């Protein structure tokens, strides 16, 4: 952290600070907890302005404000929900909703939303059982109580309601006494970090040592998330899907840093960033998240991310920023908030999409083959996909606002993320301060911070300097500060006076990042850009609540473009076009910043086999004979259909001579999986268990080296089948997609069930066996499987056999990629080697 002390003073003017509670509810970590941890300001201390306020107001007037009318059933938010004493079964749905509702209500200071929240809060606080348990009496599950505790935390910080602290104290005593007999399981075992965070918060209020014992017990009963993130162990649990469920993965990102406050070992502090590194390497997407539909789903541009994942990932980073004082945490948080979050919602915040895809060229009903598939999973609707997201999504923007600026133990403030807002709080021995943040960031590079004080006060103000910023600068009352560097937390510790002003300048340059299949995404500052696609909406259902509909979205303009980037300076190739700031910048046609770049259509790239999603982005460079034309890019979050992984126009350069892949260090570069799951362990790549999955794509899962193009060759790999099914090698493959036979090309597999080796081909999503021979395949035995392809003839060898165990002639496919495939089997692969003739 860069620190600078400034001993000079400036003229002041008068300022009146109103509506600030005199009592400071901020409590820092007590011993033996880790010191120097930042703390969230009481909710309501930060007021959104400008475009950020517009997002909250749309929530109020849209999905959040109308949620009880949209979901009036007793098992949802109806008056007979069990969270209001009725006979419904609200489980996690009500607590999810109330968690976001309370945060929105008190961030906006909205009486109507407060009233909606109060009935749930009062019922919960007034109906605690004598033993300390709260919530619906028949609900025997630790998990749903966790999000309700977040709602109570926010409510207490906003109101100082004296009922909350003894209520939570009583509950945690019950929990500590009963966890041995009734240990965490399933979702509670996955999401124990939430429980731990609230217990630590309460410890700092009461000093009750039993709360630290509770944190230890919760840590011991939870999944070993610190090890999972450190060692990329999401798939190491066989049929237990919890550690690879992407919402759990996102939600538990906070687990290591929460526990690090009690046990400040480097392994605990470092696990979050190591986990993110693993996730982004194996499953990363342009908007800053790992894919998950619902399980971790690889890097394909046609895999998606769930709305719950977006808001939980954000909350985890918001928690982490208070413990790990690194600029990259705020960078990552802004990237998700400014791209993924608005992309999940309709422009008016009335609808959401359960999943969104980096390359989502239409939004229509139909099955994709995801691990958890829903016919409405990418459709814009109040009811898109499964029910969890329509309740959990409400915390996204209000939690972002309330976590943007935090209190520091040395009685100062730290700015984690930027946006138009006002902060009113206490610093320097309970002196009132008001900081007005005037900016259109992230659509502009400049941010002004104006300090309001009734009397001078000495305190540190810590500013995050974005890692991506080129030559960032800060002026204090017109004077340039020195030693401002990108990627640092820059501390200004001085005596502040009324009307002091900081001018922050974070220059943004256009940049590209390599994505799946050697494609690129385009960014400027924290904003990722996508192709501007004209959209055509078709209402498919009108709901009883006025103004709420389901609608499909289809493209009304071409989308299959590649970028002509050439070899020149990127900032001369891609032009930045600025216009006036608008009330809601997340509407593509009125975006205040657009990019212009030359591109070409790629006629061979179209919709996939099921006509629901596009084929995955073709491997770059891609040749195109189409004319060059100027195309427009708009912010990722300003559209509900998009193209954000772009092919690059150029002469194709695929590997076609030889390739060796031993999987010594993890998942291979430029290999992509389609359907199911694939993971690395102990020097082998493995197909994952499909337990808990429901999509048609879970069988016949493929792992394809799309950057290869072989015609005649010797191709071999070690193959081990661990459960009943078949597994083997793919070759001369093109257009792989999600689905058992969703590819064009050949496959030779060892079938443990039938005791055969067979070779066949897929065409038009139909599988055709070309030839088969008996071969006793033993479970858990590694076989060396080899294919020799010469023209139309294929010879298959096993374990170095002198003669082919199988031969066949077929001329449909002349060249293509290589890959691995498993059908209904858990299989392991190693020692891939191919040499062209």
PLM feature spans:
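Short, aromatic/His-centered strand-loop micro-motif at the edge of beta-sheets
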Residues: 763-784
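Short tryptophan-centered beta-strand motifs in secreted/extracellular beta-sheet-rich domains
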Residues: 715-717, 781-790, 794-796
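Extracellular carbohydrate-recognition regions
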Residues: 41-51, 654-675
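C-terminal beta-rich recognition modules with glycine/proline-rich loops and embedded aromatic residues
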Residues: 272, 331-339, 344-450, 485, ...
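Aromatic (Trp/Tyr) and acidic
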Residues: 24-111, 145-158, 192-210, 214, ...
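Short, solvent-exposed beta-strand-to-loop segments that form ligand-recognition rims
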Residues: 797-817
């Amino acid at each position: 952290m860069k620190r600078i002390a400034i001993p000079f003073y400036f003229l002041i003017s008068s300022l009146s600070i109103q509506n600030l509670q005199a009592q400071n509810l901020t409590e820092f970590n007590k011993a033996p907890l880790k010191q120097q941890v930042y703390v969230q300001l009481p909710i309501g201390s930060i007021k959104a302005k400008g475009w950020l306020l517009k997002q909250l107001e749309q929530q109020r007037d849209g999905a959040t404000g109308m949620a009880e009318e949209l979901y009036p059933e007793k098992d949802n938010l109806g008056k007979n929900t069990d969270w209001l004493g009725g006979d419904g079964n609200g489980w996690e749905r009500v607590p999810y909703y109330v968690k976001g509702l309370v945060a929105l209500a008190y961030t906006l200071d909205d009486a109507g939303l407060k009233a909606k929240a109060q009935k749930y809060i009062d019922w919960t606080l007034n109906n605690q059982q004598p033993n300390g348990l709260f919530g619906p009496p028949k609900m025997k599950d630790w998990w749903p109580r966790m999000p309700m505790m977040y709602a109570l935390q926010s409510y207490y910080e906003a109101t100082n309601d004296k009922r909350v602290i003894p209520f939570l104290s009583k509950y945690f005593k019950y929990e500590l006494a009963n966890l041995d007999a009734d240990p965490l399981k399933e979702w509670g075992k996955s999401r124990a970090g939430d429980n731990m965070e609230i217990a630590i918060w309460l410890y700092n209020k009461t000093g009750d040592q039993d709360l630290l014992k509770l944190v230890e017990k919760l840590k011991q009963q939870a999944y070993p998330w610190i090890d999972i993130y450190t060692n990329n162990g999401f798939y190491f649990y066989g049929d237990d899907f919890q550690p690879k469920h992407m919402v759990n993965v996102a939600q538990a990102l906070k687990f290591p840093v929460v526990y690090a406050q009690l046990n400040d070992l480097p392994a605990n502090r470092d696990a979050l960033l190591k986990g993110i590194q693993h996730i982004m390497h194996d499953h990363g997407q342009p908007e800053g998240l790992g894919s998950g539909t619902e399980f971790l789903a690889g890097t394909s541009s046609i895999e998606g991310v769930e709305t719950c994942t977006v808001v939980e990932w954000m909350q985890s980073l918001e928690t982490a920023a208070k413990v790990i004082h690194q600029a990259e945490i705020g960078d990552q948080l802004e990237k998700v908030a400014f791209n993924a979050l608005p992309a999940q919602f309709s422009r008016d915040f009335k609808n959401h999409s359960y999943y969104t895809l980096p390359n989502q060229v239409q939004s229509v009903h139909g099955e994709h083959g995801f691990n958890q598939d829903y016919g409405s999973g990418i459709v814009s609707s109040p009811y898109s996909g499964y029910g969890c997201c329509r309740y959990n999504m409400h915390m996204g923007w209000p939690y972002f606002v309330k976590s943007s600026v935090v209190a520091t133990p040395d009685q100062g403030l730290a700015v984690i993320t930027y946006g138009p807002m006002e902060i009113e709080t206490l610093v320097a021995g309970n002196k009132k301060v008001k900081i007005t943040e005037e900016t259109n960031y992230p659509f502009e590079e400049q941010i002004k911070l104006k300090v309001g004080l009734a009397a001078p006060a000495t305190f540190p103000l810590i500013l995050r300097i974005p890692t991506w910023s080129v030559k960032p600068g800060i002026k204090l009352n017109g004077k340039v500060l020195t030693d401002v560097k990108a990627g640092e937390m820059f501390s200004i510790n001085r005596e502040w006076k009324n009307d002091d002003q900081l001018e922050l300048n974070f220059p943004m340059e256009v940049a590209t990042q390599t994505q799946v299949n050697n494609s690129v995404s385009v960014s400027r500052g924290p904003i990722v850009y996508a192709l501007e696609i004209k959209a055509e909406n078709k209402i498919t259902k009108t709901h009883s609540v006025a103004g709420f509909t389901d609608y499909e979205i289809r493209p009304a303009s071409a989308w299959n473009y590649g970028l002509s980037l050439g070899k020149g300076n990127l900032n001369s190739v891609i032009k930045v076009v600025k216009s006036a700031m608008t009330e809601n910048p997340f509407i593509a046609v009125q975006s205040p910043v657009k990019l212009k770049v030359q591109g070409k259509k790629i006629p061979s790239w179209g919709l996939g086999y099921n006509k629901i999603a596009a084929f995955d982005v073709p491997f770059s460079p891609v040749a195109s004979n189409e004319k060059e034309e100027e195309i427009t890019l708009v912010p990722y979050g300003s559209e509900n259909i998009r193209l954000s992984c772009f092919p690059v126009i150029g002469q194709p350069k695929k590997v076609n001579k030889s390739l060796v892949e031993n999987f010594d260090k993890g998942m291979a570069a430029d290999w992509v999986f389609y359907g199911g799951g694939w993971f690395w362990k102990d020097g082998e790549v493995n197909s994952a268990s499909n337990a808990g999955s429901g999509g048609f794509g879970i069988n016949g899962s493929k792992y394809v080296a799309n950057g290869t193009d072989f015609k005649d060759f010797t191709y071999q790999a070690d193959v081990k089948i661990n459960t009943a099914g078949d597994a083997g090698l793919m070759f001369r493959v093109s257009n792989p997609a999600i689905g058992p036979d969703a590819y064009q090309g050949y496959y030779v597999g060892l079938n443990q069930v039938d005791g055969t080796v067979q070779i066949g081909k897929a065409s038009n999503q139909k599988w055709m066996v070309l030839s088969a021979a008996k071969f006793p395949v033993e479970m858990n035995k590694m076989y060396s499987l080899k294919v020799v392809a010469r023209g139309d003839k294929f010879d298959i060898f096993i374990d170095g056999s002198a003669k082919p165990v199988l031969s066949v002639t077929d001329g449909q496919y002349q060249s293509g990629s290589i890959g691995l495939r498993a059908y209904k089997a858990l299989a392991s692969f190693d020692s891939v080697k191919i040499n062209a003739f």
